Design a protein with these regions (language model features):
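N-terminal structured subdomain of primase-like DNA metabolism proteins
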Residues: 1-112
Length: 112
């Protein structure tokens, strides 16, 4: 077989539609934050907690309208629910997007 070729029956994972997952997650972001960052609380339009580990405090903030977030103590930040899910779980963004899509019952992958 030629270098770089793949077996005819091999299946590649389809690309994830990050925009679709983020769009689906935004209306549920407060509930997701309650699950992922349980020591936090809502203050105005933000979910506020101590860090991405989810303890009480005010160093980590998630804008519930836009999905932008920052853990100011650790210097981590992101712009959407998928990046937040990835940071909280310590996984890659594609894996986080697939997991979040399953949680929200959103089909984001096309088949071959």
């Amino acid at each position: 077989m030629m270098a770089g070729a793949f077996a005819p029956h091999a299946r590649r994972r389809a690309a994830v539609d990050f925009a679709m997952v983020n769009h689906a997650a935004l209306p549920h972001l407060e509930a997701l934050c309650r699950r992922w960052l349980p020591g936090g609380r809502r203050i105005g339009a933000e979910w506020v907690c101590g860090s991405l580990r989810g303890e009480a405090g005010e160093s980590c903030k998630v804008n519930l309208s836009t999905g932008r977030w920052a853990d100011f103590a650790a210097g981590h930040r992101g712009g959407d629910p998928v990046s937040l899910a990835a940071a909280v779980a310590g996984i890659g963004q594609a894996e986080a997007a697939r997991s979040l899509a399953r949680m929200l019952n959103v089909n984001v992958e096309g088949g071959w």
